[in-house]
Amino acid sequence: GKPEDYDDEKDAEKIIIGELWVTPKTFTSDVAETLSCLRKEAKRRRKLYDDNAQYVGEFGNYLHIIGYDKDKEFDKRYGYVPGQIVEKINGGNLQWLEIFIHAPFKEDVETSKDKDDKNIISIVMQFGFKIEDVKDIVCKAIFAGDAEHPVWTHILENNTDKDRLMWNILLAPHHCSWTFFNSTSNKDEIVDAANKILTDYQIGSNAHII
């Protein structure tokens, strides 16, 4: 809800989400009942932008939609697409973090509508962490939500910079589900994309999957 309605005493056990990131699927009517409050909040925030062409957001009202609106991008004030580097969070410049967006792709957004597939539009990102007095990124982490192997195939097909897929930390895709590896019950089968992500992009021998 509106951040100005937050009551320090009554709402003490609640948090204000300064900046909300969602996919286009959030705005459809078929989201799970448990996500209805998230959809309501995303719609509230989007309306602030759509009602005022000069609005650029504020803490508790910031919104970013990751992906595409059919065949076009969303309003650049709140839209992010694959290949984009995020430079600000909550209106402030990122000093110690660099975020690169890999997915969801335009074709996967459309597939999610046709097949009611929520996993195919998972947000996939690389976080690059920095420390003071060191110019280069010192740790890279990949976060991929519920992305299954077709998403990783698309990422590899579209990626033009190997560094953007390198990782010291990989959050286990799709909560350790086998669908990261293939679409069958054959656990001896590992699709090429999964194998490459796990072997070709791991940084050193101290990388971790969590």
Model region roles, listed by residue range:
Residues G1-K10, F105-S205, I209:
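Active-site-proximal loop/helix segments of hydrolase catalytic cores
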Residues G1-A141, A147:
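Flexible, acidic/histidine-containing loops and adjacent segments that form or flank the divalent-metal
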